[in-house]
Amino acid sequence: MPVITLPDGSQRSFDHAVSVAEVAASIGAGLAKATVAGKVDGKLVDACDLISNDATLQIITPKDEEGLEIIRHSCAHLVGHAVKQLYPTAKMVIGPVIDEGFYYDIAYERPFTPEDMAAIEKRMMELIEKDYDVVKKMTPRAEVIDVFKARGEDYKLRLVEDMPDEQAMGLYYHEEYVDMCRGPHVPNTRFLKAFKLTKLSGAYWRGDAKNEQLQRVYGTAWADKKQLAAYIQRIEEAEKRDHRKIGKQLDLFHLQEEAPGMVFWHANGWTVYQVLEQYMRGVQRENGYQEIKTPQVVDRILWERSGHWSNYAENMFTTSSESRDYAVKPMNCPCHVQVFNQGLKSYRDLPLRLAEFGACHRNEPSGALHGIMRVRGFVQDDAHIFCTEDQVKKEAADFIKLTLDVYKDFGFSDIAMKLSTRPAKRVGSEELWDRAETALADALNESGLEWEYQPGEGAFYGPKIEFTLRDCLGRNWQCGTLQYDPNLPERLDASYIAEDNSRVRPVMLHRAILGSFERFIGMLIEHYAGVFPAWLAPTQAVIMNITDKQADFALEVEKSLNGSGFRAKSDLRNEKIGFKIREHTLLKVPYLLVIGDREVETQTVAVRTREGADLGSMPVAQFVELLTQAVSRRGRQESE
């Protein structure tokens, strides 16, 4: 007779094995109707699954994050149902949940078209309206093989082969369609009404370009139509903010086929890049970092010693010269250890903070490249702190404070911090892991901000802190990291002389704040929709004359502003002033200065903002003060 304990501590007793759905019904009809699945003793199960022994139970509904994931997973199965009805010769592969949606990979004789996607979506809606139950059957392995053989589902059979230890598998039936899954899934299609298919793409079986190409159908699903509409609106806004589109409009950069994953920076974009670099250079100098520069191409011997050659070679660009093999560096850390190793180091030299704006290259798959967000050639704001174990906590705490201050300067204040702890497969003693994790946790606590653990997500050699930024559209971007590493100093024989004259390995803290300049600039473009704060804008002010008579004064103002360290340009074209204002507003220049006869006479400028605000006429010195304040504020609000 199972006793079921609910989240509020109340208990319900039953005189027989009871399903999650039955427990929900015993509580109330409304909850029974909303039940998607259950969590029994912390494990997700289907609503139809039986509970035979005493257990804790949480009823999962569409309001729960797990419920939303289950809805999305079931929508992927619904894609399979619709596709098999419309295209009976299609072979179904896999259909997992992804962030805010799902996809299904399908093998078919031709690429799907937008018309196909519309037809699949229409059929899915028709199937949902049938309001049928999704039936789960735990099925012996041999029978599962027979089911998929009879249906000619070759890929499903290959997936069964990948699980030799599974003696029984869950089959989920959508009427005549059957799919294999660990589950759980929704009990009825009524939960799937708030969905939309979003795009088509190609994919490879098992993600390997050497394998056959598949069709990938993407979609999203939500708890209700209101959430779906909000998501669609957010996606439409994201498309307007696409950094590739804005990059072209503002003449920031371009990419071309002859250099896949490599950025051609134009003057405007390179200006933004240089502002970032100069800002980070100043920040690091103020915080005790020494800037260095290391080679781009390094002999494979170093990569073998560091372990990268055996674990990362397929992502490295390589070349040969005079019977020696070289690699273009995919990361800076082994080279930084070489700088540390030059000359004897004492405990008095630590902590030693080495920073580099290091150009790295990684041979990313062409299908993974995305604008300047995912590239093959990039520059990191990379640094490595060599320190004693006792110094780790302070160095981590200082880095956390520095990182959060930098993000505020770029207009990001919603930051999630996570501590990734020891994975199952790891090196080093438990005592070392305890000390490392405690030092990083204590540093996070000193920040006074909320943070969370990511159990088991650390590297095999040490824990790490991750910083995730939330942009104006609510999207999360993982940027900064602080990685504890006692492993690379060991591999590359780094040491210092301790107070007792013994040789000791330093702890190496890998750290980055922006991540890569390219990706961070892409984020900034989309976060601001190209409307950069004044300190980042490629052109901060444009001076426009009304007639040729004001040209000389316009040039004087331009010279004065540039001489004061600002980025100003004159537009002396023989065009109507309204045309000029509109053009530079579209180019998102923060300040538009108009000069007519009255301004020449009074030696002033009429100031407008790109938002259309008329700030009136003022002396150039007053405008310089206004612009100085705007630039010094960086991306922070006036109240910060």
Curated annotation (Swiss-Prot):
The protein's role, per its UniProt record: Catalyzes the attachment of threonine to tRNA(Thr) in a two-step reaction: L-threonine is first activated by ATP to form Thr-AMP and then transferred to the acceptor end of tRNA(Thr). Also edits incorrectly charged L-seryl-tRNA(Thr).
Localization per Swiss-Prot or TrEMBL: Cytoplasm
GO terms under cellular component: cytosol
Class of the enzyme per the UniProt entry, highest EC level: ligase
Record's cofactor remark: Binds 1 zinc ion per subunit.
Domain TGS: residue ranges: 1-61
Chief location: cytoplasm
This protein's encoding gene: thrS
PROSITE patterns: AA_TRNA_LIGASE_II (PS50862), TGS (PS51880)
Reaction catalyzed: tRNA(Thr) + L-threonine + ATP = L-threonyl-tRNA(Thr) + AMP + diphosphate + H(+)
PANTHER family registered for this protein in UniProt: THREONINE--TRNA LIGASE, CHLOROPLASTIC_MITOCHONDRIAL 2, THREONINE-TRNA LIGASE
GO biological process: threonyl-tRNA aminoacylation
Protein name: Threonine--tRNA ligase
Summary of subunit composition and partner proteins: Homodimer.
Family label: Belongs to the class-II aminoacyl-tRNA synthetase family.
